């Protein structure tokens, strides 16, 4: 009997992802009307997106959802101030540790979900990261760590006592204008920094004037710099060093009304939105419903925040191509029952080669025990949601159709988990959470940047610290370490953040799973031929209207968490082999044990009769040897088990 292949299951998941993204647009509008978004809708392509069954050609979409330029700015959060990390009570302010003002604690840090931010234990759990909108219309994650290092000298070290490293004015910081490196921040010397080391800002670097170089040559640079710093009142500033105002020649930091900034952030609205049109997204619309068929030709709809809609003709064939069929001789069993639904799910879960192979393709790399544990958690929520979906749908559902939908839903769940845990974006969010949790977290991140050779830093500034290339070289080193901290590959990937990465603030996982099941059922029911060319005939057979979810969950958990028959046979074979080997190695144990037991009794009897010490010593020795041979066989068995497992 033909079933969905791994290719079909993956395509079903892709279809569900795009259709869920379509519904997510209106949910985002409801939850975050002040965070503006752009989106693009186009008919799905079998070549570029996923296989489109002919029955779905009039509704299969490819949806792209992204932050607009203003939305990207609204989502940005820089979580560091002069001496630490922001908390859930830190107001938005500017710091002026250099000639460049830097804002921190933007509203997105803790006001995306204010209730969650104020819970106990969430004081330092920032809800967003720092983003930048690029020329190619992407909201990307930037390297906030290098910005922090350039702008907050206090955070460079843990003890804050290293002269010339953390008791200095900051570098001027600005985003790199090079479009090839949009994530990077560039550091630049300023007059206050150069003055701290008895130098002048010249041509982008810190240097002596020509006549100061002559005096330094005669007196020695150390002596000359000491006198110059004394004349410039540097030592008195260092005695009462203020990390928030590190130099008297820096401008004062800007004053800002943080409450007004927060109110302005919340009051943003997109007046170009067509809410009536977007309500269609939750009604399983067709291309005609969305106005994507103009004069009989398909078009792509692009919405730009605060601007409106544009329609662009598409050149590819959006209509699903019918797959080639091969002769299939297996007859359909028309006596399918509720018991067979259990068989479908159980046999699928026991086919670890297929399921584990799909998970590996998605990106999971774990032991089989860890994979089974994940399957157990998925099934606990997936099967009840599947029953809820079955009772809610108006479609006629057969047992095989529901069984194949379960398989697709399991693969889809793996895809969703992978997006949240394995992607570069997920790793970036984890890294941000560690950085923003405490100063210790910052130090730990710095220690992991193996390519950041801090040995080049000269604390007293006599060698490598002042050429104008120095901040730029350090910025490039930070950027290299920034990418290498995400994975061990040499690939460089710009990390684009999209609204769906914040889905946990918009919907629960259970709701998302339930809604996705309807899309998966639609896709599975629309498939007539699998990727191998076999006829599926999923609509043939008895209809299923309900099933015992408790029994099915128990069956699935047992299958995905306990041993299969093959694993059990392998386990018992190993145990029998160990027992046999252990017995062969201890063939004469009983004879030796009997001899030493007899000697023990004889020695004890002699000691009682003659009361001489030598007999007591023999008695103790024989007793210890007898005890050893009693436990020898068991000891060697468990020792072998410990070494092997």
Curated annotation (Swiss-Prot):
Alphabetized InterPro entries for the sequence: Baculo_p74, Baculo_p74_N
Coiled coil: none
Keyword terms of this UniProt record: Membrane, Secreted, Transmembrane, Transmembrane helix, Viral occlusion body, Virion, Virulence
Pfam families for the chain: Baculo_p74 (PF04583), Baculo_p74_N (PF08404)
Record-annotated membrane-spanning stretches: 437-457, 590-610, 611-631
A GO cellular component annotation in the UniProt record: extracellular region
Source domain of life: Viruses
Protein name: Per os infectivity factor 0
Subunit structure comment from the entry: Interacts with the PIF complex composed of PIF1, PIF2 and PIF3.
Family to which this protein belongs: Belongs to the baculoviridae p74 family.
Protein's organism: Autographa californica nuclear polyhedrosis virus (AcMNPV)
UniProt topology in membrane: Multi-pass membrane protein
Function: Plays an essential role for oral infectivity of occlusion-derived virus (ODV) and also functions in host midgut attachment and fusion by binding to a specific host receptor.
Record lineage: Viruses, Viruses incertae sedis, Naldaviricetes, Lefavirales, Baculoviridae
Biological process terms in GO annotation: viral life cycle
């Amino acid at each position: 009997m033909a079933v969905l292949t791994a290719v079909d299951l993956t395509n079903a998941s892709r279809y569900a992802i795009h259709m869920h993204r379509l519904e997510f647009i209106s949910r985002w509008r409801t939850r975050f009307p002040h965070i503006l978004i752009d989106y693009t809708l186009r008919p799905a392509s079998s070549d570029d997106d996923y296989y489109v069954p002919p029955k779905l050609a009039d509704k299969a979409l490819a949806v792209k959802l992204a932050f607009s330029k203003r939305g990207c700015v609204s989502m940005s959060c820089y979580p560091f101030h002069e001496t630490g990390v922001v908390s859930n009570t830190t107001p938005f302010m500017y710091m002026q540790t250099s000639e460049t003002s830097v804002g921190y604690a933007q509203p997105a840090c803790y006001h995306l979900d204010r209730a969650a931010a104020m819970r106990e234990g969430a004081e330092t759990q920032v809800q967003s990261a720092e983003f930048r909108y690029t020329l190619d219309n992407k909201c990307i994650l930037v390297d906030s760590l290098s910005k922090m290092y350039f702008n907050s000298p206090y955070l460079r070290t843990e003890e804050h006592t290293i002269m010339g490293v953390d008791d200095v004015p900051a570098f001027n910081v600005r985003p790199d204008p090079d479009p090839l490196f949009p994530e990077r921040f560039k550091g630049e010397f300023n007059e206050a920094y150069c003055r701290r080391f008895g130098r002048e800002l010249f041509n982008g670097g810190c240097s002596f004037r020509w006549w100061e170089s002559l005096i330094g040559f005669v007196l020695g640079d150390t002596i000359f710099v000491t006198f110059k710093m004394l004349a410039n009142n540097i030592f008195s500033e260092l005695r009462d060093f203020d990390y928030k105002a590190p130099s008297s020649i820096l401008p004062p930091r800007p004053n800002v009304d943080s409450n007004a900034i927060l109110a302005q952030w919340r009051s943003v609205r997109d007046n170009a939105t067509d809410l009536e049109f977007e309500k269609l997204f939750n009604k399983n619309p067709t291309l005609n419903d969305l106005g994507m068929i103009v004069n009989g030709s398909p078009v792509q709809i692009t919405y730009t925040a605060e601007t409106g809609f544009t329609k662009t003709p598409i050149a590819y064939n959006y209509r699903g191509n019918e797959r080639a069929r091969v002769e299939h001789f297996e007859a359909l069993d028309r006596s399918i029952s509720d018991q067979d639904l259990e068989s479908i799910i159980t046999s699928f879960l026991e086919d670890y080669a297929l399921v584990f192979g799909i998970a590996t393709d998605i990106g999971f790399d774990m032991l089989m025990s860890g994979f089974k544990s994940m399957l157990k958690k998925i099934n606990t929520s997936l099967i009840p949601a599947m029953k809820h979906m079955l009772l809610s749908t108006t479609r006629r559902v057969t047992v095989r159709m529901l069984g194949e939908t379960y398989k697709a839903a399991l693969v889809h769940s793996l895809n969703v988990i992978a997006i949240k845990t394995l992607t570069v974006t997920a790793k970036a969010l984890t890294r941000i959470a560690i950085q923003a949790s405490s100063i210790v977290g910052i130090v730990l991140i710095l220690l992991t940047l193996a390519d950041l050779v801090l040995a080049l830093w000269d604390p007293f500034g006599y060698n490598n610290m002042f050429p104008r290339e120095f901040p730029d070289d350090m910025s490039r080193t930070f950027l290299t370490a920034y990418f290498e901290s995400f994975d061990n590959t040499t690939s460089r990937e710009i990390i684009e953040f999209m609204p769906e990465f914040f889905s946990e603030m918009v919907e629960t996982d259970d709701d998302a799973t339930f809604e996705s099941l309807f899309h998966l059922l639609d896709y599975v029911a629309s498939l007539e031929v699998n990727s191998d060319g076999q006829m599926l005939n999923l609509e043939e057979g008895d209809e299923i209207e309900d099933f015992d979810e408790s029994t099915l969950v128990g069956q699935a958990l047992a299958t995905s968490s306990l041993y299969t028959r093959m694993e059990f046979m392998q386990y018992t074979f190993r145990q029998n082999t160990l027992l046999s080997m252990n017995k062969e190695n201890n063939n004469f144990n009983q004879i030796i044990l009997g001899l030493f037991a007899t000697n023990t009794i004889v020695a004890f009897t002699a000691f009682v009769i003659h009361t001489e010490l030598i007999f007591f010593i023999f008695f103790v020795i024989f007793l210890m040897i007898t005890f050893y041979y009693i436990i020898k066989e068991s000891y060697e068995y468990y020792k072998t088990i410990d070494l092997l497992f």
